[in-house]
Amino acid sequence: MKEFIRMLGELKYMIPVLRYQWPQADENASLSHSFQESTNKFGERPFVYFEEETWTYSEANKAANSFARYLSSNGVKHGDKVVLFMENRPYYAISLLALNKIGAIGVLINTSLTGDPLIHCINSSNSVKCIVGAERAQPLQEVLEDINISNKDDFLWVEDTNEYALPEWAINLKANLDFDDNENLDQTNKVTAKDVACYIFTSGTTGVPKAAILPNAKLVAAATNITMAGYRINHEDCMYNCLPLYHSTGLMLGLCAAINVGAASFIKRKFSASSFWQEANEFNTTAFVYIGELCRYLINKDPSEAELNNPIVSMVGNGLRPDVWDTFKERFDIDRIIEIYGASEGNALFMNLFNKNKTIGMTSAEVALLEYDVAEDEILKNDEGFCKKITNHDPGLLIVEIGPNAVFNGYTDKEASEKKILRDVFKVGDAWFNTGDLIKTVDVGFAFGKEHYQFVDRVGDTFRWRSENVSTNEVGEILNGYKDVNMANVYGVKVPGCEGRAGMAAFSLEDFEGFNWLEFSEYVENNLPKYARPIFIRIIQEMDTTGTFKLKKNELRDDAFNISKVEDKVFCLKPSSNIYELLDGNWLDKINSEEAGY
């Protein structure tokens, strides 16, 4: 009864979301319009806290106006692309707002990129200028001869700390700005919902990074719904945002959401678990935009005084795994965890509107879960050649129907966009976006009949062993439950003479010499079915992740258990044993000669 009464209270937040209409194509709905509206209402309230700086909405708007005028007077037009290569700081937000005010497109580059990937992202965007933070000038300088921007006037350098000097190939942007420009630009009145606000690049884990197209309508709609039904914040709140603004989580779920209601943002260059709670208290951050790995880092820290009675009430993000969820919510006394699911280039948003546990929530889009053969990496079809839907709670490939209410903007690369579309799925002529993710339905109790879902794994990350499907995420959750394991990365590796892939896990240890392999082996045996137990364990020094803390698997998968190639210690389960032991050259030779008995 208590849950039923609570759910009735959720209706007042759910109904506006269900009734929400996306902005019309020619409507003046954009990031810059939202920002100017919040500036008009809350101009003297804080916009951004950063290190020793505090910017009000009014101050940031003046700087953005001046920057926009500078760009316009130097040839940047509506629809032009401009690279933004800078770490999280106020000038990142100001730069993006300035571009949006004149209808230009921000090309948001991952700040960890160097060399060929950096060259690819810049050249594929056909940008006319590059805004570069002083802190990222060195990797840009190293590729200057290989990119398609060459004039000194086209490199706008934004100073950072005193340790960086202005390079001879760029101009000092701030020296050309008027920080008292109160007049909004006329060009902003021509910026509409259909105009592209920015390009956000994929992580490149399945090839070279691809630029996902984000129109203003998507930014505005996401920010509106997330603040209205997710965070439930207003202009008096402050959001903790340490996620990179070049990524959709930090940008759309973080900065854009705060702008939508005139809230403040505490932004950081990088996440720090050791200073998190002290900063949350200092800036009274009532909201937190997260990804799951950050939450895992926080619960792995010893309890502190700073975490007690912390100000965080609601958090919105993605990737919080079930094995972390309950512990995090209870230990830090968080009222609302609103898990989100949706790709930058995708056409659907799942949201845990009802604040249920361990779910990505529901969606208003038309979706289906398809039967999928993990071993053959293919969608199963019926005798008529159409796809087959999952009819129970088993994982299936999530697809989203493409239509007027679920537009697929895709990538700038049309060929790459087409590869993400499935056609003639259930009938001739239909079209669906292929998420590439395995999802399952879950029972969350009373939810007004709304189906709820849970993320399982990426297609390609799930592997097959002993005629069973093995989810890397689910195995990783179990391994992470062992007290001494630091964030296990699970993947499948080929074993000579065996069908499918054997499980392998990589993780670091605080105390390698003191690690109890017998106890750990018993834990694995008691908590995982035999087919899901990792055959190989690689002990690494530090986990390699993307800029948004996604675990990198490709290199680990390629290295496999080849101890002649890697310096790390590798342990294994032999077919006749349940105890992990050190893999040596003799046993490796037996594996490679198909004599090990796997």
Give each language-model segment a name.
Residues V220-C238, Y246-T286, K301:
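Conserved AMP-binding/adenylation subdomain of ANL enzymes
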Residues G115-D116, L144-L166, N260-A264, K268-F408, ...:
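Conserved adenylate-forming
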Residues E44, W157, D178-F201, V208, ...:
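Conserved pre-ATP/AMP-binding loop-to-beta segment of ANL
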Residues T56-S58, K190, A197-A221:
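Conserved AMP-binding A3 loop
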Residues M1, R6, S73-N74, L97, ...:
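Structural core segment of the AMP-binding/adenylate-forming
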Residues P23-N28, E44-R89, A93-L97, T114-I119, ...:
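Conserved AMP-binding/adenylate-forming core of the ANL superfamily
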Residues L528-L551, E567-E595:
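AMP-binding/adenylate-forming catalytic domain of the ANL superfamily
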